[in-house]
Amino acid sequence: MVEAGLIDSTAAFLSGTAKKDQAKDATGGLLRQIGASGGIIMKDFTSILSLQRDQLRKILGAMREMYDGRWSRSIGTDGGRVLHWYGRAAMFAKVTNVIDQLHEASAALGERWIFYRFDDTDAYEKSRRALINSSTPGWRQDLRDLVSAFFMGMDLSFKSRNDSWPMTAAEQMRIISMGEVASRCRSAVLRDPYTKEILGVRETEGGTRITTELGQLWQGMRIIGVPEKLCWQLTGKVALDSMPKLRRVIVDSAIAKSGVDAGHICGVTGVSKGVVRRTIEDLEVHGVIESMDIGGKTYAFVTKWMEREMQKGWR
């Protein structure tokens, strides 16, 4: 496991510095450090999102290729070479909700990330815990040591190969329903950047990729001893958290109230009516929500398909 600093170019993954200019402590880049199998931790992914658009596009493009197990970088040093990496790389990143602003671009190119969003309702308890931790020196390192010892004790290093947790047919179907819901709810809708009109025919993301990720998450939790009920709760939360936050608020409200007024969503979130209505329209395009104008107000209801899949996945 490698902790990354600021990643401001693809050179951070595979360095192409000429041999004569390399420092004694040069690592060759993050992918050389983890080798054929490992993990990269990015404690502030928000700083990457603040880069210039071209830089960001190149970094996200490299990450998408790494997801598929290979990445190559062409360089001009030492007469011109191509650097290659092959393997499995897990990435763990902490980021603010600003990542939702890049959702359409990321989703249109093929989403790879899954999300776990922390509840922001109990600010008092978070502040209390922060005060307690600030008066306990070394708690971060103690926590690292505990987690490392736990995984070492179970022989769960990235270098080891473990059998996956067996899944029954019923469990597989439940994960598939979660994946189908998650993929539709996070699918991109291509809009004109100025008029906001929808461009082109609907292209809903297939559920294969996120279903596989959710299945691996569920199996991993079962292997380390997480109770089955909690495994399902957390897997279901990650599935729904992987859509943008505003979409999640609309879906949750439509389910809880058997239909919700767009004005109510505006009041809860502080988002303008135009943005809320476009977000409802995005979900409607992918068959998650259906809208209806009643008395001059726009109401959102979950579709029959959504009701059916939610019952199968979150029963």
Label each residue range with its predicted role:
Residues 293-315:
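Short, cationic-aromatic polyanion-contact patches
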Residues 221, 257, 286-287:
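Alpha-helix C-caps/helix-loop-beta hinges
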Residues 1-124, 272, 284-285, 290-292:
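Conserved ASCE/P-loop NTPase catalytic core
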Residues 229-250:
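Short alpha-helical segments that sit at the start of domains
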Residues 74-77, 81-88, 98-236:
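Phosphate-sensing "switch" segment of ASCE/P-loop ATPases
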Residues 208-209, 270-285:
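Short amphipathic alpha-helical interaction segments
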Residues 53, 64-71, 180-183, 187, ...:
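Signal for well-folded cores of large energy- and translation-related assemblies
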